[in-house]
Amino acid sequence: MDRERKEKRNNRFTTKMQKKLVVLYLCVLLAFTGLGARLILINRDNGEQYEKQVLSQQQYSSRTIPYKRGEITDRKGTKLAVSEKVYNVVLDCKLMNEKEEYVDATISALTQCFDVDEGEIRSYNEANPDSQYYVLARQLTYDEIAPFQELEADEETGRYIQGVWFEEEYKRNYPLGSLASDVIGFTSSDNVGSYGLEEYYNDELSGTNGREYGYMNDDSNLERTTKAAVDGNNLVSTLDVNIQSIVEDKLQEFNDTYKDAVREGNGARNVGCVIMEVDSGEVLAMASYPNFDLNDPRNTDALIGQNMVDADGTVLEEVINEAALSSMDDDTLYRQLNYLWRNYCISNTYEPGSTIKPFTAAAGLESGALSGNETYECAGSLTVVAGEKPIKCHNVYGDGVLTISQAIERSCNVALMKMGQTIGETTLLKYLEDFNFGLKTNIDLAGEARTASLVFTEDTMGPTELATTTFGQGFNVTMIQMITGFCALINGGYYYEPHMVSQITSSDGSVVRNIEPRLLKQVVSEETSAKIRDYCLQVVIGENGTGHTARPAGYLIGGKTGTAETQPRGNNEYVVSFMGYAPADDPEIAIYVVVDRPNAENQDDAKFATRIVRSILTEVLPYLDIFMTEELSEEEQQELEEAQIAYEQALVSGNDVSGNDADENTEGSSEETGTGTDGGAEGSGTDGTGPESEGESSADSGTTDGSSDADGTDSSSETPADNGGYTMDDITIDPETGEGVLPDGTRVDPDTGEVIGNVELNLPESNLPLGEEDEGDSPF
């Protein structure tokens, strides 16, 4: 009975449970049915959105694929700037820590193959065990990472080396080091160009980074999606590395000769040279000294010997040495580096001196103000404004009656001032502007100086300013303005825009753009241009020419010397220059050399520049297949050999080999306040060095007495031309022959100082006998 009751109770419980289970099952079924319906609705309405979200959550890895910055080559394909693939060593601590045996094996391999500290790795790993990106070494070459990759590939050791991978990037490299450093520029750590072509063409050289994504797909397989990098374009520059090398070698030789000669520091504050094709505006070479290593632009060794620059951008007399360098704060150091990196040939401004005289003559001839048959009498000075001091010529006794050609040949200031009075302010300013003085040339380089406020206008030019402008004082120019205008002056009058790049190509070598010579205007006629060429030829070969020492043996060239006294007047500091072309009968190239304050006792000597020109052209002209047209006489051969011996002796002794001939010396500088020299930044007036290197200085002065070379006295005392600038006191007597001997070895008559023997110095005549004081100014 009890048993029957128990069975009935169990049966009732089982039935009850079955009913509950059925109800529960139905509820669950209903819930899943509702959930399924909801999912269907969600997928229908928002499926694509949620799919993207899920995929983004499933992303497994991502890395940047760096682009390759474009190359820069010279006109013949020699590589000047390239980008080389390098590798960063990256440690994934989280992966390395997955197994204990991985840690020691991986760290051991790293220290064995790379210059890394084991203690630092372990300390970092302990502090950051989940880190997945720890850079151990940067910018290694493939050869440097190869030993580690071999260890990884080894079956026995490789399985324990985990968590190390190599991040690819590109490193900018300059195969020729410091060659053309001012022109090329360099890149910063973020691959952005600074200075030169690197900055100007940064957008062309830059590419676009690519990306590689990895994620797990629906089948739990790793999927990868890659967006390729787009490499930058390449530049074919107009430079010729062979010509560039010749130029830089000669500038270096000049510095080696005059470094620390009279004062501590480089051979000059700056020395610049530009060589340009006359009929295209293409720059074959552009260099200045000092330069720097493009692969290590922040190496402070290059600053030794450079003048200090203050916070206002003014260049000081103080020279950087080891002691000064060690005491500089970061701001001061960066300021000095910025001055080093700027391109003197386009960023610095200065008064041109007598190199402007051919432009003055051209303005008169082309405008019709001058016929070319005029003559001018030079009595040694000219009173421009009644009651004011006269502006003196280099020869205070006067040059006599001169034609235009003779005035250019002798570099007579008085004759040029009289031409200016005939030409007039409006016409002269018009032609100077036509030659782009006061305007940018728009050369394709970063940092070209603005000079709009560094030249006179009709509002600021009076009679004195007109007079001094005719011979190159009171206004400022850049080297690129001068040589570009000079090319137009002697090529038939055709003004081409100067440029540094002739072609842009893609990474696969296809041509993106050809940059053809751009003819902007004709500034003078063929007839006027031919006359100017004749005038400039006489400067070099004429009996009284000031540029004899620029002529390379066997060639005829034309050109013009220049010497300009810097601000403040009377400081005996000068910018000397020579601007020329070759060959004389059919110009192919123009060359312009500027020496800014040579490190010598007597700076006012154009031969500091002409000798550089001669040494450069002696090598460049044969390289360009421009052949000699003049036979070398025995006398000329002897002169060349003796000049070479004298120069080599000077290199050994450190003596001044400038010669200081009056006829190539200071070319009458006026006392007007003018614009100063080397203005670059924010109107500093002296070597401006603002961050953009494109500042302007004021040109609204130049209104004092206008006398030349400060007060016009003792500017070239006892430095007659015939004897290299030496005086009677410099003569010693050879006891064997009784002849007089000058410090440079030249033999002279001990009583008169006249050169004896067969050696001719090819110098113009002096109006003064040796030992007699010349109180005037030397010609530009």
Can you name each region flagged by the protein language model?
Residues M1-I320, T349, T426-L432, R569, ...:
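Periplasmic/cell-envelope proteins involved in peptidoglycan metabolism and beta-lactam response
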Residues T383-A386, E631-E634, E639:
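Substrate-binding beta-hairpin/strand module that engages nucleic acids
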Residues D2, A81, Y87, M216-A228, ...:
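Beta-lactam-recognizing serine transpeptidase/beta-lactamase-like catalytic domain environment
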Residues E636, L640-A650:
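Short, mixed-charge low-complexity intrinsically disordered segments
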